[in-house]
């Protein structure tokens, strides 16, 4: 009887692993040397292309990093954000968080084209995006890390999931914590990954309410932002402002220093330092850039592990914007 009970328990455990949240199982299938034999020049090919793109326009580094973030938060890091709309499904590119703001697709397409010439049918678009995100950070002076690869590409995308899963710029602290927790990321991961706003820009429509209505904002900073972001909705909606007012083209810890002086551009930025549970993390990153870099790279690796397609799941797209 005892033997039968033990067998039953083992069967239950295996079943739960196979049917339940199997991120740990999938994680083990991603490795840093997945393409070392099948596409040995992959990393140098991606790095060269990203460097060229960022040298031409520093903002592109932030755009590629954002693409990766928005990809991973919608059904995992599967390259679904790269898919164009088709007659059979509406993709993620025109979801509210991405419409008129997601960019960098041409850079990923160019990299994919170069990789296909060298290693046809081998490297996924999902992996190219993951590597390009890392190289974008490095190109702007940020930390380096080893990217785990071995992902495959999704055959579909979900606008509904993009609308519901990607945190809004108006998110409260509790909403941010909840959104990140839903994909297995901790509060500390969330604050570290928010530090990606040390680079890039945002549209007036995303911060208008903050600069006109909120009180936890530096007055001079608000006045400066108001000059290019009119109060009336529909006027200047697409006008851009740097997320990091001090060093927008350098990956550093000034984003956190700005929060401590109430110069966070987005509502979802400033809530990280507003008398809440994350104040101490922001203060720590502001004082210790090495701590931020270390936590950021760890969080990026962890985010890259969100529900990847591996093995025989998905496909290796020939062109990133469409399925095979």
Curated annotation (Swiss-Prot):
Q: What terms describe the molecular function in GO for this protein? A: heme binding; lactoperoxidase activity; metal ion binding
Task: Provide the species name.
Answer: Arabidopsis thaliana (Mouse-ear cress)
Per the record, its GO cellular-component terms are:
apoplast; Golgi apparatus; plant-type cell wall
Q: What is this protein called?
A: Peroxidase 52
Concerning PANTHER family, the annotation shows: PEROXIDASE 52 (PTHR31388:SF24), PEROXIDASE 72-RELATED (PTHR31388)
The record's annotation in PROSITE patterns points to: PEROXIDASE_1, PEROXIDASE_2, PEROXIDASE_4
Q: Which residues form the signal peptide?
A: 1-20
| UniProt family annotation | Belongs to the peroxidase family. Classical plant (class III) peroxidase subfamily.
Stated role: Removal of H(2)O(2), oxidation of toxic reductants, biosynthesis and degradation of lignin, suberization, auxin catabolism, response to environmental stresses such as wounding, pathogen attack and oxidative stress. These functions might be dependent on each isozyme/isoform in each plant tissue.
Q: Which UniProt keywords apply?
A: Calcium, Disulfide bond, Glycoprotein, Heme, Hydrogen peroxide, Iron, Metal-binding, Oxidoreductase, Peroxidase, Secreted, Signal
Q: How is the cofactor bound?
A: Binds 1 heme b (iron(II)-protoporphyrin IX) group per subunit. Binds 2 calcium ions per subunit.
Disulfide cross-links: 39-119, 72-77, 125-320, 204-229
Additional observations: There are 73 peroxidase genes in A.thaliana.
Q: What positions does UniProt annotate as the active site of this protein?
A: 70
In chain numbering, the residues marked as site (Transition state stabilizer) are: 66
Residue positions binding Ca(2+) 1: 71, 74, 76, 78, 80
């Amino acid at each position: 009887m005892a033997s039968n009970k033990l067998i039953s328990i083992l069967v239950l455990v295996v079943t739960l692993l196979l049917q339940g949240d199997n991120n740990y199982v999938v994680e083990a299938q991603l490795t840093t040397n997945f393409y070392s034999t099948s596409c040995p020049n992959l990393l140098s090919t991606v790095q060269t292309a990203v460097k060229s793109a960022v040298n031409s326009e520093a903002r592109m580094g932030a755009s590629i990093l954002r693409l990766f973030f928005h990809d991973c938060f919608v059904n995992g890091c599967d390259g679904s954000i790269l898919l164009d709309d088709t007659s059979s499904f509406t993709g993620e590119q025109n979801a509210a968080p991405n419409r008129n703001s997601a960019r960098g697709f041409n850079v990923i397409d160019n990299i994919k084209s170069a990789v296909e010439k060298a290693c046809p049918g081998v490297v996924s678009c999902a992996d190219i995006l993951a590597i390009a995100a890392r190289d974008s950070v490095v190109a702007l002076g940020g930390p380096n890390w080893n990217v785990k690869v071995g992902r495959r590409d999704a055959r579909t995308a979900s606008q509904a999931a993009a609308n519901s899963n990607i945190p809004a710029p108006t998110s409260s602290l509790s909403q941010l914590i909840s959104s990140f927790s839903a994909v297995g990321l901790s509060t500390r991961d969330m604050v570290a990954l928010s530090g990606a706003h040390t680079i890039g820009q945002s549209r007036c429509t995303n911060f208008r309410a903050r600069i006109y209505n909120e009180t936890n904002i530096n007055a001079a900073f608000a006045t400066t932002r108001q000059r290019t972001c009119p109060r009336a909705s529909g006027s200047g909606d697409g006008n851009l402002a740097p997320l990091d007012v001090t060093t927008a083209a350098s990956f550093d810890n000034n984003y956190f220093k700005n929060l401590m002086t109430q110069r966070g551009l987005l509502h979802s930025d400033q809530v990280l330092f507003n008398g809440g549970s994350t104040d101490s993390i922001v203060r720590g990153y502001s004082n210790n850039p090495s701590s931020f870099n270390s936590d950021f790279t760890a969080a990026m690796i962890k985010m890259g592990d969100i529900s990847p397609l591996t093995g025989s799941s998905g496909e290796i797209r020939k062109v990133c914007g469409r399925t095979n």
